[in-house]
Swiss-Prot record:
Its cofactor is Zn(2+). GO terms for cellular component: cytoplasm. This is Methylthioribulose-1-phosphate dehydratase. It is found in: Cytoplasm. Gene3D superfamilies: Class II aldolase/adducin N-terminal domain (3.40.225.10). Zn(2+) binds at H117, H119, H202. Residues 1-10 have a biased composition (Basic and acidic residues).
Length: 240
């Protein structure tokens, strides 16, 4: 297997005329996220699961310039640790795998079809406001805002309503991305209905059953975070 990967690099896995193919979707999404200010300076990442394959954007590449041939492909399931045991079936030889990989795998192990990691300024700001106002162990909470309806209640439970309170757990940042994995897993266990985890002074991980749901949930959350920051400036409470 290793010799075959080295010989052909399984390029056929990222070659498709289908615009919905993960190798085509990931570059398109990364360009959008770059234009929205979510993934500046090569930060952030995106991964999509299709069947028993996981497609992941590379590390260290300007997100607006990613091309299908830059995409890594993993077999799924695959070990998270050690990195050397991960079952890559396509590795662009000149690029490094994403440091987000074990965190993406954590979402996929819980049934996600797509996981997005952004460095949104609004996400970072709300983690700082929550820490200052409520302490380091508090989660982000907001209610009575229409856009909350864009976030699921939990697997198979429908969507949140206007009068519901949205809660997003917050974990502390670490010096290295992969070291966030344990905290992410713990937050997912403590908040089993969540589809997102904020990382203080860093950004957010958002996942969904498929690409469209992950993207729209990420958009809804970013809207809510920006609104929360502006509400705080005006002295308006996030929860009524």
């Amino acid at each position: 297997m290793a010799q075959e990967i080295e010989k052909t690099n399984n390029d056929h896995l990222v070659q498709s005329s289908d615009p919905e193919h993960p190798a085509n979707l990931i570059p398109e999404l990364c360009r959008k996220f770059y234009n929205w200010g979510w993934v500046t300076g090569t930060g952030g990442g995106t991964s999509i699961r299709r069947g028993d394959h996981i497609f992941i954007a590379p590390s260290g590449v300007q997100k607006e310039l990613i091309q299908p041939h830059n995409i890594f492909v993993l077999e799924f399931p695959t070990p998270k640790y050690p990195p050397s045991d991960r079952k890559y079936i396509r590795k662009p030889l000149e690029l490094k795998p994403s440091a987000c990989t074990p965190l993406f795998l954590t979402a996929f192990e819980r049934g996600a079809g797509c996981c997005i990691h952004t460095h949104s300024q609004w996400a970072v700001l709300v983690t700082l406001l929550v820490e200052r106002e409520k302490g380091p162990d508090a989660c982000f909470e907001i209610s009575n805002i229409e856009q909350i309806k864009g976030i699921p209640r939990g697997k198979g439970k429908g969507m949140l309503g206007f009068f519901d309170t949205l809660r997003i757990p917050i974990i502390e940042n670490t010096a290295f991305e992969e070291d966030l994995t344990e905290s992410l897993e713990k937050a997912m266990d403590q908040y089993p209905d969540t589809y997102a985890v904020l990382v203080r002074r860093h950004g957010i991980y958002v996942w969904g059953d498929d690409v469209a749901k992950a993207k729209t949930q990420c958009e809804s959350l970013d809207y809510l975070f920006q609104l929360a920051v502006e509400m705080h400036k005006l002295g308006l409470p996030w929860v009524k």
